A protein has these predicted regions:
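Peripheral, non-AAA+ core regions of ATP-driven protein-machinery
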Residues: 1-198
Length: 198
């Protein structure tokens, strides 16, 4: 497999636009390029991706790697495309199976160490993905609580690139306790807990 497509999403004001991240790996002068009406922070993600993969234990092959974002007429902003780019590249070089990314949306920022960081707009993105026929979403662990508000869609909240690879290769997923703790805490609070309320 030298080509792959991963579903993701972008916020356009208050609206959500589904975005498709394509990765093509071919012979030629080693190069990593990204195209498709990208903001500076999205263009910079190629360096985060390369370094994060290295620190996760995966060295990109010395080939021409092209990342394309569809549709081209939508301006891609923010760092939430880091994780789908990683997923697309890993699929294109054969680290994760293509079938695992079918009907799956991927959103998330990554650090240079390979950790996955939270992004804004997860709730509307997951809701729109469900409306478009997506059956599962891979999101940052810290976004799990809001993602789980959308029912009848599988949510995989990951803390690292390594965990995403594990899940996409059929590994066991253990739901984080983050959302449950937040929900429990919210139920326990009442007005007497707020200073000045009696």
């Amino acid at each position: 497999m030298s080509f792959s497509t991963v579903k993701s999403a972008a916020m356009e004001g208050l609206a959500v636009e589904m975005v498709y991240v394509e990765a093509d790996v071919s012979d030629g002068m080693p190069l990593f390029e990204m195209v498709g009406s990208l903001s500076p922070e999205v263009k910079e993600s190629k360096e985060r991706v390369r370094t994060a993969l290295k620190n996760t234990g995966y060295i990109l092959p010395p080939k021409r790697i092209t990342i394309n974002f569809i549709p081209a007429n939508i301006r891609k902003t923010g760092s939430g495309f880091d994780l789908p780019v990683v997923a697309a590249v890993l699929c294109a070089i054969g680290i994760v199976p293509e079938e695992a990314l079918k009907d799956t949306m991927v959103v998330g920022e990554i650090s240079l160490s390979g950790d996955v960081k939270p992004v804004n707009g997860i709730l509307p993105m997951v809701a729109e993905a469900k409306e478009r026929g997506v059956t599962r979403c891979i999101v940052p662990a810290e976004n799990q609580t809001e993602a789980l508000l959308v029912k009848e869609i599988e949510i995989f909240a990951v803390q690292s690139i390594a965990e995403m690879i594990h899940i996409l290769n059929g590994g066991t997923y253990i739901e984080k306790e983050i959302g449950k703790v937040v929900a429990k805490t919210a139920q326990m609070l009442d007005f007497s807990d707020i200073q000045g309320q009696y």
